[in-house]
C-alpha cells in the first residue's frame, strides 16, 4: 500500500553496490516532497558510500516522472558527480508499477 504523501529515500551502497544504509530524506505532501541535495548526500559521505539509489512513491499511483522529478534527478546527478558519489538510479513507485530513470536510459542524460 502506498503512503498518502510523497516520501523520498536514498539507498546507500558500497563499492560492490551492496546496500549499506537507508536514508529517509524527506516526507512531503500528497503531490511533492522537498529534496535538498545536502540531505541526500551527507549520510552517504559519512558512510563512505560511493553510490546511491534514490526512490520515492507517487501517492496518485502513477509512477510516471513529473517535470519536478526530472529536474530533481538532474540536480542530484550533477551534485553527485561533483562529490564523487554516483547516482545509479531514481526509482518512482506507483500502484504495483515503477519507473526507473536508469532503465529508461535518461539518468545519464542529466549529466552536463
Language-model regions, residue ranges each:
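Long amphipathic N-terminal alpha/beta scaffold segment
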Residues: 1-20
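Active-site-proximal loop/helix of nucleotide/amide-processing enzymes and allied scaffolds
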Residues: 12-16, 26-112
Amino acid at each position: 500500500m502506498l503512503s498518502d504523501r510523497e516520501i523520498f529515500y536514498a539507498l546507500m551502497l558500497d563499492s560492490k553496490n551492496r546496500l549499506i544504509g537507508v536514508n529517509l530524506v524527506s516526507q512531503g505532501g500528497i503531490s511533492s516532497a522537498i529534496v535538498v541535495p545536502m540531505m541526500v548526500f551527507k549520510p552517504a559521505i559519512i558512510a563512505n558510500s560511493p553510490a546511491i539509489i534514490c526512490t520515492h512513491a507517487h501517492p496518485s499511483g502513477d509512477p510516471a516522472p513529473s517535470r519536478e522529478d526530472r529536474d530533481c534527478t538532474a540536480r542530484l546527478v550533477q551534485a553527485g558527480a561533483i562529490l564523487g558519489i554516483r547516482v545509479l538510479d531514481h526509482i518512482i513507485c506507483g500502484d504495483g508499477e515503477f519507473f526507473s530513470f536508469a532503465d529508461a536510459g535518461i539518468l545519464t542524460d542529466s549529466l552536463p
